[in-house]
């Protein structure tokens, strides 16, 4: 039960951080491309790869990996934004966003893992 509560506590902080970045992006970045979600998901992928490479206790992994980074990253928002660009026939943004999100996420999770193994 303590692990579930730990993950939930971490998720609160991850969601607060995501909310802050998303609102900052709405005020300061172009609305033509979902920069905030891309930034959130790519940094989250890197950090999760890093966390995964380290020998943390299950408690810390639940707090940071499952909790904070689970609350921070947003797979569902990514896919809704992709659908929106497809629906609006904005195929160039759709393609670029999909490639950067999925390809970049995969590259950054491996890079985060590699950095974590070197430290």
Curated annotation (Swiss-Prot):
GO biological process: cellular detoxification of fluoride
Catalytic reaction equation(s): fluoride(in) = fluoride(out)
Membrane topology: Multi-pass membrane protein
CC annotations in GO: plasma membrane
Known regulation of activity: Na(+) is not transported, but it plays an essential structural role and its presence is essential for fluoride channel function.
Single Gene Ontology MF annotation: fluoride channel activity
Stored Pfam families: CRCB
Protein keywords: Cell membrane, Ion channel, Ion transport, Membrane, Metal-binding, Sodium, Transmembrane, Transmembrane helix, Transport
Binding site for Na(+): 70, 73
Main location: membrane
Annotated compartments: Cell membrane
Transmembrane segments: 1-21, 33-53, 56-76, 93-113
Family membership noted in the UniProt record: Belongs to the fluoride channel Fluc/FEX (TC 1.A.43) family.
Function recorded in the entry: Fluoride-specific ion channel. Important for reducing fluoride concentration in the cell, thus reducing its toxicity.
Protein name listed in UniProt: Fluoride-specific ion channel FluC 2
Organism encoding this protein: Lactobacillus johnsonii (strain CNCM I-12250 / La1 / NCC 533)
Lineage: Bacteria, Bacillati, Bacillota, Bacilli, Lactobacillales
Gene: fluC2
């Amino acid at each position: 039960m303590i692990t579930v509560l730990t993950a939930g506590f971490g998720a609160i902080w991850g969601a607060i951080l995501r909310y802050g970045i998303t609102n900052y992006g709405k005020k300061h970045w172009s609305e033509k491309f979902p920069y905030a979600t891309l930034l959130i998901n790519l940094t989250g992928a890197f950090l999760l790869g890093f966390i995964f490479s380290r020998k943390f206790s299950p408690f810390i992994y639940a707090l940071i990996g499952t909790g904070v980074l689970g609350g921070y990253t947003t797979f569902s928002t990514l896919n809704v934004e992709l659908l929106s660009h497809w629906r609006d026939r904005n195929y160039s943004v759709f393609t670029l966003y999909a490639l950067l999100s999925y390809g970049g996420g995969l590259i950054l999770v491996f890079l985060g893992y590699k950095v974590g193994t070197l430290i």
